[in-house]
Amino acid sequence: MNVLTIQNVIKSFGSKKVLCGLELSVQEHSIFGFIGKNGAGKTTTMKAILGLTKCDSGAIYVMGEKVHFGQTNTNRYIGYLPDVPEFYSYMTTTEYLTFCGNICGMDKADITVRSTELLKLVGLGQEKRRIKGFSRGMKQRLGIAQALLNRPKLLICDEPTSALDPAGRKEILDILLSAKEQTTILFSTHILSDVE
């Protein structure tokens, strides 16, 4: 089954065409690496999938449901990691994930179990410090945990390894590979070796 289907999507900003008839489909429990140079339309595509950018023409479907600009109905299936995730720096990892789970309407017991499971997955299970002391790599890992919290069918990661050193990039890619058992992953990058 296709979790994501994009059909002939066209998007321009003024006279500049960014997406020219984009077609793709992503099957369940797969990892799809979206590669291109800066300005190639990777982030625009991801924002269109989330219903945050209006396409000039074409159609996008998540779990068989059409995505509409400005409506978030299909976002219940999606977890999203932006290229630079933002957090409430005064919180701990557990406080932050509890806050996010409450926003999603998750059951309190489920938030606790899921937070523990995900923090272990991303290597932050023993972390008790406030987020303000985190490195960029630690923030990326917490962002992945947050994006997976509500068990999305599709995890979208916008340049998850950008600005990380080689060891940090490998850690994030290993986490995404582990997360494939739980969800389908679409990630963008301009680094060819990340896709390989």
Where does each model-flagged region fall?
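Hydrophobic anchor residue at the start of the ABC signature
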Residues: 144
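Catalytic Walker B motif of ABC-type/P-loop ATPase nucleotide-binding domains
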Residues: 155-158
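Helical segment within the ABC ATPase nucleotide-binding domain
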Residues: 169-182
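Conserved ABC ATPase "signature" region
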Residues: 98, 102, 109-126
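Walker A (P-loop) phosphate-binding loop of ABC-type ATPase nucleotide-binding domains
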Residues: 37-41
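Conserved ABC transporter NBD signature motif
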Residues: 58-69, 73-74
